[in-house]
Amino acid sequence: MGRYHIVGRAGAGSLIAEFLFREVGVDYDISFPDPAEVKRADFHARNPLGRIPVLICPDGHQIFETLAIINHITTHFDGLAPAVGTPLHDRYSQFMALLATSIYPAYHRQHHSHYYAQESGFDDLRAKAVAEQAVLYDYIEFELAPYICG
């Protein structure tokens, strides 16, 4: 049986898989493809959108999208997430979905506005993204205090 292999890039969500593997003491390999490589057809066979991260599992199957990678790791290694079937796991799943479907997209709109609007609309787009994030961060702070940021 092989090892896990993370295909990553700084700032692209691959750090989360590294944190989880280190927490449970799992050895893994990691590579950082250059921008030209992620545009090639063979990389798109891993992820049709050409995005990073991708997790290549020991048996060879591949997983893309950070939330799916987190779900794989937390279900295969004990102690990383609450037990399935418990109210605490439901809450955990809710926060994971919130991060993946609301917080990260708002962050991306704020910092990568060129994907979503013409330059003339950047300021408005960014302001809306910041406002959306503020509501979400206030919610998380209320729900998870004192566990994050004191």
How should each PLM-predicted stretch be described?
Residues 79, 142-150:
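Surface-exposed helix-capping loop/turn segments at secondary-structure junctions
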Residues 2-125:
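GST-like domain detector, emphasizing the conserved glutathione-binding G-site
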Residues 125-144:
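Amphipathic alpha-helical packing segments from all-alpha helical-bundle domains
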